[in-house]
């Protein structure tokens, strides 16, 4: 089982949805950084369940306890170990259906991989519950990046067929960034927000769920970060983004739309402005040859509908190898997309900080006076 990721900055995760706790170990955080716990807890709160009618009613405090690596609020350079206690499990919801493989979940694949020994309650180690660990680690990374004037902004680009405005030229707007972080459904267009909420409520009332797309922008990363081929910026980001259980697709810049265009339309032409190389457009999403060009890194992430729905579905009983019908009980999200937004921001922050510490550590150190 692969539970560690990173190069200079490493994250190891542990735990299961209905176990005692989930948590992680972050190795590689620079010493001497005074952490702002209010900042970190605000990021965690945006992911937290049970806050509105678009989310599961399961309530978890998502309060992380740091066990090492921070002393008097300042990083020591030692690994930061932390845990988040699970406090609101309804494990009995899963007893009657433990032999039924839930469609859209990792029940069957996990059963085959781990010979039936994996914890089936709430998805166990496969659960989106573990994104709380990714979010906490990424919130620390995001705080450090912001101290170096690198900012990450994400929003819900679409729910179903309803599409919000793109970030585009607004990516560097502190006002927009702050606004989105305060919203239950972080979208740019207030009109589209109404339609999205209606779609989510319609799915909920029909015992169904709905997916969408999250758009994310990273600004302030200097040119020259990344590598060609196997360690491209796209590869590194995608590797960790796909650790989010609901993610099923990623595109950078104009992505698949570029396949319909001509080069004259999507080549990001350049000029010198105030002595600096500037791109006149950003169709490639701030990355060329796997390396940053100082334009905003733009990517979109496809989020599938929450697979736990109360409708009757065909499945199999793995114990007696027979067909079966399952109706999933429990507390589930009619749309997970809004809660995924801070997770994607956090994952992006962790990867970007890892790359910066690997290739340009002085850039971070100098801005923190380390």
UniProtKB/Swiss-Prot annotation:
Disulfide bond residue pairs: none
Protein keywords: Amino-acid biosynthesis, Aromatic amino acid biosynthesis, FAD, Flavoprotein, FMN, Lyase, NADP
Chain positions recorded as FMN binding sites: 125-127, 289, 304-308, 331
EC number: 4.2.3.5
Positions contributing to NADP(+) binding: 47
Source taxon at top rank: Bacteria
Cofactor names: FMNH2
Keyword rRNA-binding belongs to the record: no
Reactions catalysed according to its record: 5-O-(1-carboxyvinyl)-3-phosphoshikimate = chorismate + phosphate
GO cellular component, one term: cytosol
Co-factor note (free text): Reduced FMN (FMNH(2)).
Keyword Ubl conjugation: no
Pathway(s) per entry: Metabolic intermediate biosynthesis; chorismate biosynthesis; chorismate from D-erythrose 4-phosphate and phosphoenolpyruvate: step 7/7
HAMAP family referenced in this protein's UniProt entry, alphabetically: Chorismate_synth
Biological function: This reaction introduces a second double bond into the aromatic ring system.
Description of how the protein assembles with itself and partners: Homotetramer.
Family statement: Belongs to the chorismate synthase family.
Protein known as: Chorismate synthase
């Amino acid at each position: 089982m692969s539970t560690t990721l990173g190069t200079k900055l490493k994250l190891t995760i542990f735990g299961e949805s209905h176990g005692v706790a989930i948590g992680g170990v972050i190795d590689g955080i620079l010493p001497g950084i005074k952490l702002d716990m209010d900042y970190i807890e605000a990021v965690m709160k945006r992911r937290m369940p049970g806050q509105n009618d678009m989310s599961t009613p399961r309530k978890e405090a998502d309060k992380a306890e740091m066990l090492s690596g921070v002393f008097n609020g300042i990083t020591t350079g030692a690994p930061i170990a932390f845990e988040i206690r699970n406090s609101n499990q309804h494990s009995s919801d899963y007893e009657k259906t433990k032999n039924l493989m839930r469609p859209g979940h990792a029940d069957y694949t996990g059963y085959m991989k781990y010979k039936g020994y994996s914890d089936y309650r709430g998805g166990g180690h496969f659960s989106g519950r573990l994104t709380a660990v990714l979010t906490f680690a990424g919130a620390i990374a995001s705080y450090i990046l912001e101290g170096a004037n690198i900012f990450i902004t994400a929003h819900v680009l679409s729910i179903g067929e309803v599409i919000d405005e793109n970030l585009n030229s607004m990516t560097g707007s502190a006002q927009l960034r702050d606004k989105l972080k305060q919203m239950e459904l972080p979208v740019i267009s207030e009109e589209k927000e109404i339609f999205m909420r209606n779609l989510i409520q319609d799915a909920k009332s029909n015992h169904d769920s709905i997916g969408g797309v999250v758009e994310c922008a990273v600004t302030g990363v200097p040119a020259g970060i990344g590598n060609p081929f196997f360690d491209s910026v796209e590869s590194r980001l995608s590797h960790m983004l796909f650790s989010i259980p609901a993610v099923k697709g990623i595109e950078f810049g104009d992505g698949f739309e570029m396949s319909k265009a001509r080069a004259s339309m999507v080549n990001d032409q350049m000029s010198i402005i105030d002595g600096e190389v500037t791109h006149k457009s950003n169709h490639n999403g701030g990355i060329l040859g796997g390396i940053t060009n100082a334009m905003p890194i733009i990517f979109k992430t496809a989020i599938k509908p929450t697979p736990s729905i109360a409708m009757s579905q065909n499945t199999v009983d793995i114990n007696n190898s027979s067909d079966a019908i399952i109706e999933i009980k429990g507390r589930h999200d009619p749309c997970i997309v809004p809660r995924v937004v801070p997770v994607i921001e956090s994952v992006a922050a962790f990867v970007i900080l890892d790359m910066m510490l690997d290739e340009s550590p002085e850039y971070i150190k100098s801005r923190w006076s380390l």
